[in-house]
């Protein structure tokens, strides 16, 4: 099982435009080398403004590596030349490193029509 750093935290969401994406290989496993322009940042946490000021308006290179089983994550499908996507910008305070992650999207739907008026009141809906 892969070991992941435990100290990364999301400090902002960045809007990017994919400028290039090239499949490759590292250690016999597939990779995707990407280059994207960081257009803007939103939901910037207090204290991260300076880091984001250095990133917004720049071109970034980011390589997506496969997992231990040799499979690339599903997020590679979004990295198509010309695509505009949102990524979580994460920072590790222990070593000063940054990384990008695709925001998790909750696929669940909230159908309040199944709730009684009392249940809606309890849930604040």
What are these regions (language model features)?
Residues 90-121:
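OB-fold/S1-family single-stranded nucleic acid-binding modules
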């Amino acid at each position: 099982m892969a070991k992941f750093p435990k100290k990364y935290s999301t400090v902002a969401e960045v809007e990017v435009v994919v400028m290039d994406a090239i499949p490759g290989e590292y250690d016999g496993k597939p990779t995707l080398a990407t280059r994207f322009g960081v257009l803007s940042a939103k939901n910037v946490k207090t204290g991260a403004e300076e880091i984001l000021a250095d990133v917004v308006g720049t071109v970034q290179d980011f390589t997506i590596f496969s997992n231990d089983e040799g499979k690339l994550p599903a997020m590679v499908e979004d990295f198509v030349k010309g695509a505009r996507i949102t990524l979580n910008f994460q920072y590790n305070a222990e070593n000063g490193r940054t990384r990008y992650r695709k925001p998790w999207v909750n696929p669940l739907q909230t159908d309040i029509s199944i709730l009684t008026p009392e249940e809606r009141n309890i849930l604040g809906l």
